[in-house]
């Protein structure tokens, strides 16, 4: 009898312990669920090369702890790969122009750089790139300064030349230092195509200030084959941040060189606006890469893009830049209203001029986004 009572006590004690553990797990799940309700979900969407991932990295620098040394070092092979890939693209481009252009002679690489060019072409075609040594950096610099490569670079919009080209080519000696560790600025310029989904949690006013909202920002791949991965993220979104690279009105897609990037952006923007799950979702449109746009617009007419074919320049210099920007902005506004159901046009829609590489601009923009969304939440709660 005593043995039976002892066993029962052990079983009862085990049951009580298990019940306590279950209750604790349920309590934690309930707390986490409540906490999740206070976290607003933001989707960062846009076509490939729109600057989404640069904005994502800026958020990490601005509103989190930034990149530690290990993370900075992890970008070293990426940056070196960007250098090798870019010089290969330029070398390939110069060959193509030399064969097909009427004024072909100016695209022919000088005799002293031909051997270097072939060597770098072979390296750029490898799957694994060597460490960027001082010798290789000097050879790349020599080829970069070759008149034929500079003429090719001037036609970069016809090729797939990345925006980071100037920056990395100007810093080759530093990038090839034996003890080189990438800087924060280097990381912002580094180009890696986003595949899948990455996320970050932040507050634009700082974690210790109760007045600010907490956001979870999702960055998803912009190339066409990545977009199917967005679907499961569509539910319960507080706002969509759509990035449009306005400087790319004369460029083609990485994945389809017959397709204009701005036309692709327009169609993607309209498709997202029409999704039923976004009927009540706020939209923040970032007209990005303004720094490149303001230089390009003075050289390349806006009406080379089919969407902007009715554009008429009115001035020169700064006035023309503003006129062109306002025209693009108006086109996106028209697209928004044409793609939004009449009973939903009152949902929050804001447009911001952005330069993803400019930390001050990104910080100011996200504080404005935060204010807009907090105001919307107060209105919905009947507190305004």
UniProtKB/Swiss-Prot annotation:
UniProt key word GTP-binding: yes
Keywords linked to the UniProt accession: GTP-binding, Hydrolase, Lipoprotein, Magnesium, Metal-binding, Myristate, Nucleotide-binding, Palmitate, Transducer
Annotated G-alpha domain residues: 38-384
Signal peptide: none
Keyword Transcription belongs to the record: no
GO molecular function: G protein-coupled receptor binding; G-protein beta/gamma-subunit complex binding; GTP binding; GTPase activity; metal ion binding
Annotated region (G1 motif), positions in chain: 41-54
GO biological process, one term: adenylate cyclase-modulating G protein-coupled receptor signaling pathway
Binding residue positions for GTP: 49-54, 163, 188-189, 194, 222, 288-289, 291, 356
Record-level GO cellular component terms: cytoplasm; heterotrimeric G-protein complex
Disulfide bonds: none
Xref: PROSITE patterns: G_ALPHA (PS51882)
G3 motif: annotated segments: 215-224
Cofactor: Mg(2+)
Stretches for region G5 motif: 354-359
Lipidation (N-myristoyl glycine): 2
Record-linked InterPro entries: Gprotein_alpha_su (IPR001019), GproteinA_insert (IPR011025), P-loop_NTPase (IPR027417), Plant_Gprotein_alpha (IPR002976)
Binding site for Mg(2+): 53, 194
Location of the region described as G2 motif in the Swiss-Prot/TrEMBL record: 186-194
Stated role: Guanine nucleotide-binding proteins (G proteins) are involved as modulators or transducers in various transmembrane signaling systems.
UniProt note: domains: The helical domain (70-190) is required for self-activation.
PANTHER family per record: GTP-BINDING PROTEIN ALPHA SUBUNIT (PTHR10218), GUANINE NUCLEOTIDE-BINDING PROTEIN ALPHA-2 SUBUNIT (PTHR10218:SF343)
Subunit structure: G proteins are composed of 3 units; alpha, beta and gamma. The alpha chain contains the guanine nucleotide binding site.
Name this protein carries in UniProt: Guanine nucleotide-binding protein alpha-2 subunit
Organism listed in the record: Glycine max (Soybean)
């Amino acid at each position: 009898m005593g043995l039976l009572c002892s066993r029962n006590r052990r079983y009862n004690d085990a049951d009580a312990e298990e019940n306590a553990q279950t209750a604790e797990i349920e309590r934690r799940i309930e707390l986490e669920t409540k906490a999740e309700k206070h976290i607003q979900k933001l989707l960062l969407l846009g076509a490939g090369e729109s600057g989404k991932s640069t904005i994502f990295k800026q958020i990490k620098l601005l509103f989190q702890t930034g990149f530690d040394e290990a993370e900075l070092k992890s970008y070293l092979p990426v940056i070196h790969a960007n250098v090798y890939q870019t010089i290969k693209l330029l070398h390939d481009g110069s060959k193509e122009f030399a064969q097909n252009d009427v004024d072909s002679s100016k695209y022919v690489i000088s005799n002293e750089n031909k051997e270097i060019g072939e060597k770098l072409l072979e390296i750029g075609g490898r799957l694994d790139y060597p460490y960027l040594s001082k010798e290789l950096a000097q050879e790349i610099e020599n080829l970069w300064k070759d008149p034929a490569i500079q003429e090719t670079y001037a036609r970069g919009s016809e090729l797939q030349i990345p925006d980071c080209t100037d920056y990395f080519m100007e810093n080759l000696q530093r990038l090839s230092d034996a003890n080189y560790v990438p800087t924060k600025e280097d990381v912002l310029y580094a180009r890696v195509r986003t595949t899948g989904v990455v996320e970050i949690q932040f507050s634009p006013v700082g974690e210790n200030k109760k007045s600010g909202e907490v956001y979870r920002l999702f960055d998803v791949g912009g190339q066409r084959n990545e977009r199917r991965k967005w679907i499961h993220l569509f539910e319960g979104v507080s706002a969509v941040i759509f990035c449009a690279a306005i400087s790319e009105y004369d460029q083609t897609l990485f994945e389809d060189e017959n397709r204009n990037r701005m036309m692709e952006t327009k169609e993607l923007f309209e498709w997202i606006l029409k999704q039923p799950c976004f009927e009540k979702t706020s939209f923040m449109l970032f007209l990005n890469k303004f720094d490149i746009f303001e230089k390009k617009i003075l050289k390349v007419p806006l009406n080379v893009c089919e969407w902007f074919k009715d554009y008429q320049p009115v001035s020169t210099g700064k006035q023309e830049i503003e006129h062109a920007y306002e025209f693009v902005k108006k086109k996106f506004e028209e697209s928004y209203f044409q793609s939004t159901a009449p009973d939903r046009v009152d949902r929050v829609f804001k447009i911001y001029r952005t330069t993803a590489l400019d930390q001050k601009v990104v910080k100011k923009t996200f504080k404005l986004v935060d204010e807009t969304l907090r105001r919307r939440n107060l209105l919905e709660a009947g507190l305004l």
